[in-house]
Structures are given as structure tokens and as C-alpha cells.
């Protein structure tokens, strides 16, 4: 559905119907709100309609969803350019070019932003009035305006309008601003709060009287100084941030050289210059981590998380700080033997950003915790006692109770093959065949020479009517214990069942059950889907001479035997 709406939007955009394109892209976004391409397309449509504020919002959303996509910054730059924010447009295009230095659209946009920034602003009476060098002097020369300049709020308003004449529209209801524009444009602007007597009085004032008013010596200079101080403060902030970045780069270089003390010095200096970038804290934490100063690392990470939330920093940065803290806690846990705090922090980091590296560290911490618990619980003597209790209960046919004791024995000694063997026997008695098979295989894995493992596994497979597999298991066991009577009896029982199948001695119900079970076996499925075996089976029915040749092929006969054992094929 979202793709359909997107296609309609693209078609409308191509046809020049940008309003319709916006509607279609909005419909698509409602269906797929995390699709960055849809926001990008709608941003372009808004920009084509000269709705640059909406275009900017969509472009910013595109960047948030896909920060590594160069086109997102092309959209962002175009929106800023439409709003005449040349510096922001320049920054957006530069960021995009860092991702894709050869992108023609970004290069063109950057050139447009540079040209627009250097182009003189369009002249208008308001722009000229507010940008003139004598603005403050002319206002001071007027008695009413001079009185208004005593109010810092009014001075701030006039400074804002001087920086951006378009802000004049925000203050149309302010009598002081209207009077000031009248003074600067040399026109008479009547304000609603003046009554007729005021107009008459103003009309009676002569030009000489206006000129003869004493001019203050300091008010305009003070206003200009305020503006200059603010600009100087902004410049100083930019300079400090730039110096902080240089310190960070120097710290990174020292870190790569394993010069940790120097790296810490640079990161600390960066923090002094700019406390609004938490990467300085996380980088210093990384150095402390390498040095084994885990407590210092944790402190920096906690500061980074706290400061990051205050600044509403990127959630990825906060997640990075949490992951680094978790790593320090995990390393400390090797001594403290408490992995729970590290696990908790890793889980918290994953809620901020599901990062594969963090997930890997969480799994490692959980595994280490489990291994530690097993080490602390390990006691072969208690394991033997639990196994003996299980044996007594097994003899009493109390299989569920016996299973619990065998499980306890395994926890106490995970390497005890006998405990797995005995629990497999319990599971078989209880009809829990998959669990019994798993324990029997674990028993064989721990001790391949232990014949009980093979008898347990064979018994489970025999109970599951997988006679050919049980036969293979018993034969494998005989390799380690050739005279084991239990294994020999198992082989005899399997052969009887296989012969019974080949003679077709099963009841229809038994045959149907065996065939249904066999069809679930991937090996049986593979044999039946093999074109060569399909032809072989056909030859056995229709071409006796060809069948004689097939009988000489051991691989073919092995597969035929599997089908016979499964009840799929019967020999008559």
C-alpha cells in the first residue's frame, strides 16, 4: 500500500502537480512512518511549492532516519537555502559531501549556498532603514525614540530587527517599534493610542524644536556595544568549540599510539573548552578502560549519560556510554564474581540503541555468569550422591523423582556421562523421547567408549520405530565393546523389525503409521525425490534385467534398505 501511494506521488511530482505529490507522499508516510525515502520525496515536493519550513521539517526527519544517506543532506540544504539560511545550507551540503565527495547535486548545492551568501541582500525601505550605520544616531535624535531606548527590551527588539528586518512583522502592534520605523523612514505613522490632541501637539512642534533637543552622548554607543558583545560572545563560543575539536583529534591520535596519559590530557582540555559534546567524556572513558582504571571509566560514562540526557544528545551516544560502562563492570566482575550489574547496564544500553556489539557483550556477560555459577556449584562428591539417590528411585519405578536427582547430579558435575545415561533411561520410561535422545547423545559425546550411551540412544530410537537408525547406533557401540550383550540384543531386535517390514507383516494401521513417520525424515524425503532412485524403483517393478544390475550397486541397495525399513517399499 505504501509503495502504491509512493508511486502516485512520484507520478504527480513528475507531472508538476506538487500539491498532489505532497498528499500522496503523506498517505505513504502514514502507512510506513519509518521510510526515509518518503520524507525525502515529500521534502522535495514542499520545496517545489516554496513551502520551505515544511520542506525543512521533512528533510530533518530524513536525516534522523538515515544519517548516512547523502541525499538527505541535499534535501536539508535546499530547504535551508529556500529559507535564506545560507550558513545552515552550506553546513548541510558540506556534511553530505563528507559522505559522498563526488556527489554532483551536493556540489551544485554547495556552490549555490556560497553564491547566495556572498550576494548582497535585496534592498527594501525596511532593510535599508535598519541596516544603515546611523540607525542608532537617528533614533537618539528623536525625543520619543530616545526615551524608548532606555528600555533594554526595546533595544533588544531593535537589535533583532536590525539583524533580520523580516522580524519587523512580529512587532507591528508595538507602538515604540512603529514610531521608530517612522523616524527611520522619515514618515509620520499614527498609532492607535494617540488621541487628536496628541496629533495637534505633534503638528505644532517645529523642526527647529526637534533639532534643538540635547543629544545624549552614550545611549546609541551602549546599544551598539550590546550588539557587538553578543556577536563577540558567539564568536568566542565557536572558537572554543573549534579548539575543543582539535584537542579531541589530538587525543584520538595519542590513544592510537597507546599514549594514554597524553590522550586523557587532551580529552580533559576539550571538556574544559566545550561541555556540550559528550564524546569527550566517552573517549576519555575508553582510555581509562584500556588503562584498567574501571572506576574512573564508570564515572565518566555516568556523567556522559546524565549530560547527554540534559542536552538531548543522540541516543546512540548515550548507548555508547552505557555499553562502555557495562564493559568496565564486566571486567570488574572477573574479580568481584558479580556479572549482574554489567548485564543490567548492557540491557539498558540496548533499549537506547540495539547495537550488535552491545548485544555480543551482553551474551558474553550472561555466559560468563552462567559458567561462574556452574563453577561455584561444581562438586563431584555431591554429584555422585545425587546420582545414587536417582538410581534408588529408578529401581522403585519413581521416574519423575529419579529424573530430578539425575538433573541435580548433572548440575554438580556436568562432565558425568553416567548421570546423562541414567537420565536418558528415565526420559525413555516417561515417554519423553526427544529429551532422552539428547541426553544419550550427550553421554556419548562425553565418553565415546561408554557402551551405555549407545544402548540408551538405540533404545530411544527403537521406541520411536526408527529401526535402521537404532541398528546403526548399536553397531557403532559394538566397535567399542564387541561382546556387549545388550548391544547384540538390540541389533537382533532391529533386524527382526526390519525383516518384518520387508515381508510386509505389519498391519495396515502399523504400516500407515510407519510411512507417515518416515515421510518426516529428511533422508527418506531426499531418496524419494532423487530422479535416479525413482527410476530404480520403477525398474524393480517393470524391468527385472535392469533390477539385477541395480542390486549389484551397494549405494543403491543401501537406499532401498532404508525405504524398506521405513515401510515405504515392501519386497514380495
Swiss-Prot record:
TPR repeats lie at residues 2-35, 37-69, 70-103, 244-277, 279-311, 319-356, 383-416, 417-450, 451-484. The tetratricopeptide repeat (TPR) domain, forming a carboxylate clamp (CC), mediates interaction with the highly conserved 'EEVD' motif at the C-terminal ends of HSP90 and HSP70. Residues 192-253 are annotated as: Disordered. GO terms for biological process: cellular response to cold; cellular response to heat; chaperone-mediated protein complex assembly; response to heat; response to unfolded protein; response to wounding. Induction: By heat shock, heat, cold shock and wounding. Its main location: cytoplasm. Expressed ubiquitously, with maximal expression in cotyledons, followed by shoots and flowers. The gene is HOP1. Mediates nuclear encoded chloroplast preproteins binding to HSP90 prior to chloroplastic sorting. Mediates the association of the molecular chaperones HSP70 and HSP90. Co-chaperone that forms a complex with HSP70 and HSP90 and preproteins (e.g. chloroplast preproteins). Interacts with HSP90. Phosphorylated. GO terms for cellular component: cytoplasm; nucleus. Keywords: Acetylation, Chaperone, Cytoplasm, Nucleus, Phosphoprotein, Repeat, Stress response, TPR repeat. It holds the Pfam family TPR_16. Residues 198-210 have a biased composition (Acidic residues). GO terms for molecular function: Hsp90 protein binding; preprotein binding. Residues 235-253 have a biased composition (Basic and acidic residues). It comes from the Eukaryota. Residues 142-181, 521-560 form the STI1 domain. Transmembrane segments: none annotated. It is found in: Cytoplasm; Nucleus. This is Hsp70-Hsp90 organizing protein 1.
Amino acid at each position: 500500500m505504501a509503495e502504491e501511494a509512493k508511486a502516485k506521488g512520484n507520478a504527480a511530482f513528475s507531472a508538476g502537480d506538487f500539491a498532489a505529490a505532497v498528499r500522496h507522499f503523506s498517505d505513504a508516510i502514514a502507512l510506513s512512518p519509518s521510510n526515509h525515502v518518503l520524507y525525502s520525496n515529500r521534502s522535495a515536493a514542499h520545496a517545489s511549492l516554496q513551502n520551505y519550513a515544511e520542506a525543512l521539517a521533512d528533510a530533518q526527519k530524513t536525516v534522523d532516519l538515515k544519517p548516512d544517506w547523502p541525499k538527505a543532506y541535499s534535501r536539508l540544504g535546499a530547504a535551508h537555502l529556500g529559507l535564506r539560511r545560507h550558513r545552515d545550507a552550506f553546513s548541510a551540503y558540506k556534511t553530505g559531501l563528507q559522505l559522498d565527495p563526488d556527489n554532483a547535486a551536493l556540489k551544485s548545492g554547495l556552490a549555490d549556498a556560497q553564491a547566495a551568501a556572498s550576494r548582497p541582500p535585496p534592498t527594501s525601505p525596511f532593510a535599508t532603514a535598519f541596516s544603515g550605520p546611523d540607525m542608532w544616531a537617528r533614533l537618539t535624535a528623536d525625543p520619543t525614540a530616545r526615551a524608548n531606548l532606555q528600555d533594554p527590551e526595546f533595544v533588544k527588539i531593535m537589535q533583532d530587527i536590525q539583524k533580520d528586518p523580516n522580524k519587523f512583522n512580529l512587532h507591528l502592534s508595538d507602538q515604540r517599534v512603529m514610531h521608530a520605523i517612522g523616524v527611520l523612514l522619515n514618515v509620520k505613522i499614527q498609532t492607535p493610542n494617540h488621541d487628536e490632541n496628541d496629533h495637534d501637539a505633534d503638528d505644532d512642534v517645529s523642526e527647529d524644536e526637534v533639532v534643538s533637543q540635547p543629544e545624549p552622548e552614550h545611549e546609541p554607543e551602549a546599544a551598539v556595544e550590546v550588539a557587538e558583545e553578543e556577536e563577540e560572545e558567539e564568536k568566542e563560543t565557536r572558537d572554543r568549540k573549534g579548539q575543543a575539536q582539535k584537542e579531541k583529534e589530538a587525543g584520538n591520535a595519542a590513544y592510537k599510539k597507546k599514549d594514554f596519559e597524553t590522550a586523557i590530557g587532551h580529552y580533559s582540555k576539550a571538556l574544559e573548552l566545550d561541555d556540550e559534546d559528550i564524546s569527550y567524556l566517552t573517549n576519555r572513558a575508553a582510555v581509562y578502560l584500556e588503562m584498567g582504571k574501571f572506576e574512573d571509566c564508570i564515572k565518566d560514562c555516568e556523567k556522559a549519560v546524565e549530560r547527554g540526557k540534559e542536552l538531548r544528545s543522540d541516543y546512540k551516544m548515550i548507548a555508547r556510554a552505557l555499553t562502555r560502562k557495562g564493559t568496565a563492570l564486566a571486567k570488574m566482575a572477573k574479580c568481584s564474581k558479580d556479572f549482574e550489574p554489567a548485564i543490567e547496564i548492557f540491557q539498558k544500553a540496548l533499549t537506547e540503541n540495539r547495537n550488535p556489539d552491545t548485544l555480543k557483550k551482553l551474551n558474553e556477560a550472561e555466559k560468563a555468569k552462567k559458567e561462574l555459577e556452574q563453577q561455584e556449584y561444581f562438586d563431584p562428591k555431591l554429584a555422585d550422591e545425587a546420582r545414587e539417590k536417582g538410581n534408588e528411585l529408578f529401581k522403585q519405578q519413581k521416574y519423575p523423582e529419579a529424573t530430578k536427582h539425575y538433573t541435580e547430579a548433572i548440575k554438580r558435575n556436568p562432565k558425568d556421562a553416567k548421570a546423562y545415561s541414567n537420565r536418558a533411561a528415565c526420559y525413555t520410561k516417561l515417554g519423553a523421547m526427544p529429551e532422552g535422545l539428547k541426553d544419550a547423545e550427550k553421554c556419548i559425546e562425553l565418553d565415546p567408549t561408554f557402551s551405555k550411551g549407545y544402548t540408551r540412544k538405540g533404545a530411544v530410537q527403537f521406541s520411536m520405530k526408527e529401526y535402521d537408525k537404532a541398528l546403526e547406533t548399536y553397531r557403532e557401540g559394538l566397535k567399542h565393546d564387541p561382546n556387549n550383550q545388550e548391544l547384540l540384543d538390540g541389533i537382533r531386535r532391529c533386524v527382526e523389525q526390519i525383516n518384518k517390514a520387508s515381508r510386509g507383516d505389519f498391519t495396515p494401521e502399523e504400516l500407515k503409521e510407519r510411512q507417515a513417520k518416515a515421510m518426516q525424515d529428511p533422508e527418506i524425503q531426499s531418496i524419494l525425490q532423487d530422479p535416479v532412485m525413482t527410476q530404480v524403483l520403477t525398474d524393480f517393478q517393470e524391468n527385472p534385467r535392469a533390477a539385477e544390475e541395480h542390486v549389484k550397486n551397494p549405494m543403491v541397495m543401501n537406499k532401498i534398505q532404508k525405504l524398506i525399513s521405513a515401510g515405504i517399499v515392501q519386497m514380495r
